[in-house]
From Swiss-Prot:
UniProt record similarity statement: Belongs to the bacterial flagellin family.
SUPFAM superfamilies recorded: Phase 1 flagellin
Keyword Iron-sulfur among record annotations: no
Identification of the protein by name: Flagellin
GO cellular component entries: bacterial-type flagellum; extracellular region
UniProt keyword Secreted, yes or no: yes
Subcellular location(s) per record: Secreted; Bacterial flagellum
Keywords: Bacterial flagellum, Secreted
Length: 498
């Protein structure tokens, strides 16, 4: 080896080794201080990618476990409300058993029915107000998906149902008969009295009525109309004033005579969907029904409505609306425009049949047993929505209370309702157990993944402490050797001194 001064190769080699050892010492100190074997991708690129995927799974599964616990809380909240609904149903059943014995008076039954109604109202309140984090859990049918995994479509569904008196089949539930039928004064709701209605049959037309007082050609009267039972109008056909309406007088024997000085001061308008003729004088609609023997009506509107029974069968009928807003079932002749009130008969709790009675729409559910409507038999307890209620009798009397509102087979109805609640509670119990199992599995999976991640990225302190100690010793030795290497060029001076 040449003796040189400018380049100390031994010192350079020693410095390089010291730098390498310094890097190893720094890595060991970093791992020991962070606890991680992989502090950056340069430590282990593949290991860093694997560990990062584990981190995503672990965090996702941890949140999924929290989601599942929330799902358990939803099911518990819902079941708690159902438990209270069940308590109310059991009380209603107890009261119903009490009501079915024959020793109860009408007053007793009324008291029992009041508590039953209160219990059913409470069921409706619980159904409408039970919430979890702002979500109504018993107010409507639906489902709630609980995310129980770290990836897409890893869910458990909680089925929710609307549970109230209506869905339980207890809407209008009653343990007593409405067996008192009262009547009001003669009906004026149709804008016409029920006596002395003008009918086309049996009317004798006088000679004077055959000719318009202001015309010269022969004319005849097509019909006579009234809006209040006192003032009458006649429609003229033929002659100079064909199609016009004039005031007339009607004698007790049915003779119709043109009123003195009568003028055609009435206009004709169309009455909605019925194609019937309405006389309007001064903005007041008058009688439009020119059918012999039919009740007359001061109509606000006639429209087609649909009734649906519990089996989903539809029945179409016309709804006749009077000036008070009451709706009555009606028949409409599309050709003549004639509107007549549809009548029914019904049987009260004593078994007595009523006289023909007009059908009023919009009554309370389960209040009327309808024997016959256009040849079809219905029990209004089976009706859904617009139930039937008697309103106007053929004799002109309005029924304000209707018979036979007692629920058929009430205990069976309650047993069915309780069974429905039990079935829902069973499904909630099953989903609670499933979610609880999911939480256990998620926790186990999270533990195993965390251990796997630890083996990849965590520092082994025994190894790293050993590596650090080794690097420190080498560092100290390197520093000592470097001092010796730096003194080698001085040996060349001895050659110069000689």
């Amino acid at each position: 080896m040449a003796q040189v001064i400018n380049t100390n190769s031994l010192s350079l080699i020693t410095q390089n080794n010291i730098n390498k050892n310094q890097s190893a010492l720094s890595s060991s100190i970093e791992r020991l201080s962070s606890g991680l074997r992989i502090n950056s991708a340069k430590d282990d690129a593949a290991g860093q990618a694997i560990a990062n995927r584990f981190t995503s799974n672990i965090k996702g599964l941890t949140q999924a476990a929290r989601n599942a616990n929330d799902g358990i809380s939803v099911a518990q909240t819902t079941e708690g409300a159902l438990s209270e609904i069940n308590n109310n149903l059991q009380r209603v059943r107890e009261l119903t058993v009490q009501a079915t014995t024959g020793t109860n008076s009408e007053s007793d039954l009324s008291s029992i029915q009041d508590e039953i109604k209160s219990r059913l109202d409470e069921i409706d309140r619980v159904s409408g107000q039970t919430q979890f984090n702002g979500v109504n859990v018993l107010a409507k049918n639906g489902s709630m998906k609980i995310q129980v995994g770290a990836n897409d479509n890893q869910t458990i569904t909680i089925d929710l149902k609307q549970i109230d008196a209506k869905t339980l089949g207890l809407d209008g539930f009653s343990v007593k008969n409405n067996d008192t039928v009262t009547t009001s004064a003669p009906v004026t709701a149709f804008g016409a009295t029920t006596t002395n209605n003008i009918k086309l049959t049996g009317i004798t037309l006088s000679t004077e009525a055959a000719t318009d007082t202001g015309g010269t050609n022969p004319a005849s009267i097509e019909g006579v109309y009234t809006d209040n039972g006192n003032d009458y109008y006649a429609k003229i056909t033929g002659g100079d004033n064909d199609g016009k309406y004039y005031a007339v007088t009607v004698a007790n024997d049915g003779t119709v005579t043109m009123a003195t000085g009568a003028t055609a001061n009435a206009t004709v308008t169309d009455a909605n969907t019925t194609k019937a003729t309405t006389i309007t004088s001064g903005g007041t609609p008058v009688q439009i029904d020119n059918t012999a023997g039919s009740a007359t009506a001061n109509l606000g509107a006639v429209s087609l409505v649909k009734l649906q029974d519990s089996k989903g069968n539809d029945t179409d009928t016309y709804a006749l609306k009077d000036t008070n807003g009451n709706l009555y079932a009606a028949d409409v002749n599309e050709t003549t425009g004639a509107v007549s009130v549809k009548t029914i008969t019904y049987t009260d709790s004593s078994g007595a049949a009523s006289s023909p009675t007009a059908v009023k729409l919009g009554g309370d559910d389960g209040k009327t047993e309808v024997v016959d409507i256009d040849g079809k038999t219905y029990d209004s307890a089976d009706l859904n929505g617009g139930n039937l209620q008697t309103g106007l009798t053929a004799g002109g009397e309005a029924l304000t209370a209707v018979a036979n509102g007692k629920t058929t087979d009430p205990l069976k109805a309650l047993d069915d309702a309780i069974a429905s609640v039990d079935k829902f509670r069973s499904s909630l119990g099953a989903v609670q157990n499933r979610l609880d199992s999911a939480v256990t599995n998620l926790n186990n999976t999270t533990t195993n993944l965390s251990e796997a991640q630890s083996r990849i990225q965590d520092a082994d302190y025994a190894t790293e402490v050993s590596n650090m100690s080794k690097a420190q010793i080498i560092q100290q030795a390197g520093n000592s050797v470097l001092a010796k290497a730096n003194q080698v060029p001085q040996q060349v001076l001895s050659l110069l001194q000689g």
